[in-house]
């Protein structure tokens, strides 16, 4: 484990160096007759540099043949916003969705299978008619072969583009005899948030599906995020590595593959402790981070957030302390735009037996659910 980290190597993945700004020319007095040609030359040079730098930036950030669409979305009218927030049910989130997840659910364990079946059954019960798939596989681990299974739910698999929300549902393995670790923030709460969002927006999502909206919602519940022995490239991210590779090979119309249908990949992790702070990890998706920040401000001004004394508490400006290896990495490496919603610094209960329901902060959980619900409604035009 490295200081200040998540027990994971702090690699600056997905980042690029910034080009040095052009130095302004030294000021001097020029003959009047040469001024116009010089200004024209500077204008042409500036235009050329702007075009070149924009092209160069795109070639650094995007793999060949991949384009980044920038959807035009508007803010919800206040009445509609209040209706969306009012459809969320804090009691349902906590009792119906969160508590069944608060069990030991290490990969290959009975608890892991129990939670996987719960996720599948819950998603299949929604009236919007989600297309639910299981991605089972066996992987070699330091403990020998282990069975894993990702749950993939797509509202409308025929849609051209996907807004993908993801989290991991496995819990970290501790030595025999250790206090049971249920990973409330890591990542039972993110899983419960996704289920509550899908249920609360069920009618709106059903309507969007019937209207064949070009962008649909996709939910990924990933297995095997945690290392089974010691974090490394071959002992971590089992589910996301397998699923990203699989999605890269499955055709999707208009194509070419499922992974290229992902318009934005939002990964939720380490949520539920009091006073979380989030930072934008990737310049490519900073506009969506700013959108979440704006929604937090707006909900605060409308008195729709609890235990929220300041206008902005969660979505902070500035640089994160460092990059974190998490389930977004296999997708990021394939050119998928990533918005990483992980609390940094990590919660004090991280990877300790204290990461339980009693140490969660319900107002924070419900506030994040409201912010995400408004974000989904605006992004998808619900």
From Swiss-Prot:
Membrane topology qualifier: Single-pass type I membrane protein
Gene3D superfamilies membership: Zn peptidases (3.40.630.10)
GO annotation, cellular component aspect: Golgi apparatus; Golgi membrane; membrane
Pfam families linked to this entry: Peptidase_M28
Subcellular localization: Golgi apparatus membrane
Catalytic residues as annotated in Swiss-Prot or TrEMBL: 225, 269
Disulfide bonds: 167-191
One annotated GO molecular function: zinc ion binding
Residues annotated as transmembrane: 35-55
Recorded catalytic activity of this chain's protein: N-terminal L-glutaminyl-[peptide] = N-terminal 5-oxo-L-prolyl-[peptide] + NH4(+)
One record GO biological process: peptidyl-pyroglutamic acid biosynthetic process, using glutaminyl-peptide cyclotransferase
UniProt entry keywords in alphabetical sequence: Acyltransferase, Disulfide bond, Golgi apparatus, Membrane, Metal-binding, Transferase, Transmembrane, Transmembrane helix, Zinc
Keyword Ribonucleoprotein part of the UniProt annotation: no
Top EC group: transferase
Record CDD domains: M28_QC_like
Residues reported in the UniProt entry to bind Zn(2+): 186, 226, 351
Its biological purpose: Responsible for the biosynthesis of pyroglutamyl peptides.
Name of the protein this chain belongs to: Glutaminyl-peptide cyclotransferase-like protein
Native source organism of the sequence: Homo sapiens (Human)
């Amino acid at each position: 484990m490295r200081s200040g980290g998540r027990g994971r190597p702090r690699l600056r993945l997905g980042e690029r160096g910034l080009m040095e700004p052009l130095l302004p020319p030294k000021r001097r007095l020029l003959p009047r007759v040469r001024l116009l040609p010089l200004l024209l030359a500077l204008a042409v040079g500036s235009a050329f540099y702007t075009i070149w730098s924009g092209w160069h930036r795109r070639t650094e950030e995007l793999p060949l043949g991949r384009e980044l669409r920038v959807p035009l979305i508007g803010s919800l009218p206040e009445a509609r916003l209040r209706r969306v927030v009012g459809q969320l049910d804090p009691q349902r989130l906590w009792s119906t969705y969160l508590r069944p997840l608060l069990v030991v659910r290490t990969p290959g364990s009975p608890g892991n299978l129990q939670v996987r079946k719960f996720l599948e059954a819950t998603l299949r019960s929604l009236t919007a008619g989600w297309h639910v798939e299981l991605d089972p596989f066996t992987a070699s681990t330091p403990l020998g072969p282990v069975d894993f299974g990702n749950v993939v739910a797509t509202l409308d698999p025929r849609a051209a583009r996907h807004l993908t929300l993801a989290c991991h549902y496995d819990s970290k393995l501790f030595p025999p005899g250790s206090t049971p670790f249920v990973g409330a923030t890591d990542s039972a709460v993110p899983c419960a948030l996704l289920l509550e969002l899908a249920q609360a927006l069920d009618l709106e999502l059903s309507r969007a599906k019937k209207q064949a909206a070009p962008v649909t919602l996709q939910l990924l519940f990933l297995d095997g995020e945690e290392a089974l022995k010691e974090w490394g490239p071959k002992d971590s991210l089992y589910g996301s590595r397998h699923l990203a590779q699989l999605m890269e090979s499955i055709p999707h119309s208009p194509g070419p593959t499922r992974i290229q249908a992902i318009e934005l990949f939002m990964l939720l992790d380490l949520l539920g402790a009091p006073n979380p702070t989030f930072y934008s990890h990737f310049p490519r998706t900073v506009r969506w981070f700013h959108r979440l920040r704006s929604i937090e401000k707006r909900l605060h001004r409308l008195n729709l957030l609890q235990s929220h004394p300041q206008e902005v508490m969660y979505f902070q400006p500035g640089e994160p302390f460092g990059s974190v290896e998490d389930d977004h990495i296999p997708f990021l490496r394939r050119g998928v735009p990533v918005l990483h919603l992980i609390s940094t610094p990590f919660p004090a209960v991280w990877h300790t037996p204290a990461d339980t329901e009693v140490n969660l902060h319900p107002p924070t959980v419900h506030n994040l659910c409201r912010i995400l619900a408004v974000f989904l409604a605006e992004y998808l035009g619900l």
